[in-house]
From Swiss-Prot:
Residues 1-46 form a transit peptide. Belongs to the COQ4 family. This is Ubiquinone biosynthesis protein COQ4, mitochondrial. Pathway: Cofactor biosynthesis; ubiquinone biosynthesis. Its EC number is 4.1.1.130. Keywords: Lyase, Membrane, Metal-binding, Mitochondrion, Mitochondrion inner membrane, Transit peptide, Ubiquinone biosynthesis, Zinc. Transmembrane segments: none annotated. The gene is COQ4. Residues 14-48 are annotated as: Disordered. It comes from Podospora anserina (strain S / ATCC MYA-4624 / DSM 980 / FGSC 10383) (Pleurage anserina). Residues 38-48 have a biased composition (Polar residues). It is found in: Mitochondrion inner membrane.
Amino acid sequence: MEVTLKRSAALARQTTPLLRPLRPVATYPSNNNNNNNPTPQQRRPYSLFSSLTRPPPNYPGHVPLSFVEKTALAIGSGLISLKNPRRGDLIATFAETTSTPYFIYRLRDAMLSSPTGRRILRDRPRITSTSLNLPYLRSLPPNTVGHTYISWLDREGVSPDTRSPVRYIDDEECAYVMQRYRECHDFYHALTGLPVVREGEVALKAFEFANTLLPMTGLSVFSLVGMKKKERERFWGVYGPWAVRNGLRAKEVINVYWEEVLEKDVGELRKELGVEVPADLREMRRREREEKKRREAAARG
């Protein structure tokens, strides 16, 4: 009798397959007692994460994103930051969501190919007002990298403590590479003398794009659309060619261990890196304003 029942059950399973639940095998763990610990692939078979299935962070502050989420965030942050370039948080988000899967790894590999870059990756230094000892930098001779840097900070009214932490890059080492690039940005300003006005930022971003290939730096050039005619002419005539020429020929600026060259002559460092100082943008803008005032005064007189 028992044998007959087993055969009947087996026959029913073979002849009525459509009565069984239709579900992907890899999506849910089996009810079998031998599969109480499903693999991450079984728990997360799709690219969309829910609040219950999102992977754990790989480092403090990390926010894992699916491909769809990362794409949506990249498009949204890119469009809004083009319209409002003062949104540093969105610019940072766009940089992170567009740097993978290729660009940030290329920058990491550039660091690994350099002895100094490898030391930076090993030491993981951070650039803050505390780590740099700003009062000490003010005491350095005017021709040093440190004094040039602090003088630029004071003149532009900015601080090294304003850089957002990286959140959306999955690889922990690549996240540090992005953080390092972000915190070194003001050193690039000081090295080139470019101010933080929109025109200066676009010129520096063009230089960074030629040197690092990070997509965010290239997108920044499109903000020229919202700039004045004189500013666009100045970029295409002066700062754009300078940025491309210097960015391509200069050594990888991400490999400069800034903390170790603060007492170095800034002119010597520029020569070693292959970076020329462009025309003084603030001075050009000042002369332009004065010329405009003279023309207006002459027209009234």
